[in-house]
Amino acid sequence: MDRERTNLLPTPFSIAVLLTFITFILALFLAEPTIKGNHLIELLSSWEKGLWNPPLLVFALQMMLMLVIGHVVALSGPIDSLIKKITIYCTNTAKSAAIITFFTVFVALFNWGLGLIFGAIFARKVGEHAIKNKLSLNYPLIGAAGYSGLMVWHGGISGSAPIKIAEAGHFLEHKMGVISQSNTIFSSMNILASVLLLIILPVFMYFLGKKHDINNISINLDISKKENISKRIEGVEKIDHSKILAYIFGGVILFFSFYKAFIIPDNISLNIITPNYINFVLLGIALVMHKNFYNFLAAVNDAIKGASGILIQFPLYFGIMGVMSYSGMVEMLSTFFVNISNETTFPIFTFLSAGIVNIFVPSGGGQWAVQGPIIIEAANQLAISIPKSVMALAYGDQITNMLQPFWALPLLGITGLKASEILPYTIKLFLIGIIIFVSVLLIF
């Protein structure tokens, strides 16, 4: 699986390092040194400051927690039971593809980590169901349906750019202020886009399943029941396995989340939705759903592996942003966009450029750190709606996830599929998504 991915592109870490070198080379030729003879040292200093920029490191941890805790929720018993109940309606490829796509997109609009793992587990359960009941199933198409949530997540409640700019003290506040999610995620433009995606994508996958209704489960899905080996719990271990303690702790978190959102404020507002608030709520839900700390921590140990990319790559992107800001490249690129754009074309150019950047920077948070300053500077110069510009970037970032295999790795591991098997179908989702997103950007 990893070998196949690296045949398409280098590892995301290698790409981040290469982008760092490219940024340095461009900055050396484009930027004027403030101290003669020390230009390289100045660039290295700005890079080092960017690596460990405190607000950006907080942002990285917030995104990492959002992925991990969302993954933990997806591994809980209630989610597993829900998937099993829905699976009984998946009797052929067309129905299965439509049902998985709808629920995966719906869940991903709430949390991208949850949507990613939910879709992967759902796809595998449907494959196991087909084998058990001797049903014909195009398993790669089902895998693609389980990955569809990654083309809608940035327009959802956990979208990196929209939730970050809704938080006081974000790193671009001095250029754009704090923008509520009522102007981004819950804007009429994005609500229309989300509704269209929820309707069109499942319908499209249904007819795609009708057209490609072939029996293609070429991998070995173990459907045998695993024997549960009971272990005698003694002494202080009882604390780790205590349902009461997990329910109380998780319940207190959920109670205060509700109290903070609906009781404390004089007016209920979407401003409450910040990265910290989302993670706080997810933590409470995860603790309650796993019923004890032992199960919760076991799920965390499983989920944390998927967050390694955020942990090690985000600082490199922050360093790139530091060099670009110091060297004046942000202003240069912004001026370029201003010169070739107008009020109508700027959101489209933003969407397309974000899609291209996402191929090389497969992280919404990392991309926002690098491209966000350029987009906001250009939008300010053109006097164009900043919320719309942010959403155009979000749409572009998420759509090319259907081409970029980085975030598909957890799904490929869970389903046993290869990237080359799901790619023919995710490319079709990519094309449908472009039509939807460009249309709403032009309408509004």
Give the ranges of each region predicted by the language model:
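Hydrophobic alpha-helical transmembrane segments of multi-pass integral membrane proteins
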Residues: 89-122, 311-327, 338-377, 394
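Membrane-interfacial loop-to-helix junctions in multi-pass transporters
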Residues: 11, 52-60, 87-99, 132-141, ...
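Alpha-helical transmembrane segments of multi-pass membrane proteins
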Residues: 94-108, 133-157, 177, 181-182, ...
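Hydrophobic alpha-helical membrane-insertion segments
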Residues: 12-27, 140-163, 313-317
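Hydrophobic transmembrane alpha-helices of multi-pass small-molecule transporters
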Residues: 1-65, 186-199, 203-309, 313, ...
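Early transmembrane hairpin of solute transport permeases
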Residues: 50, 54-56, 61-168, 360
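Membrane-core helix-loop-helix motifs of multi-pass transport proteins
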Residues: 123-215, 408-440
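Cytoplasmic juxtamembrane regions at transmembrane-helix boundaries
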Residues: 74-99, 210-231, 310, 317, ...
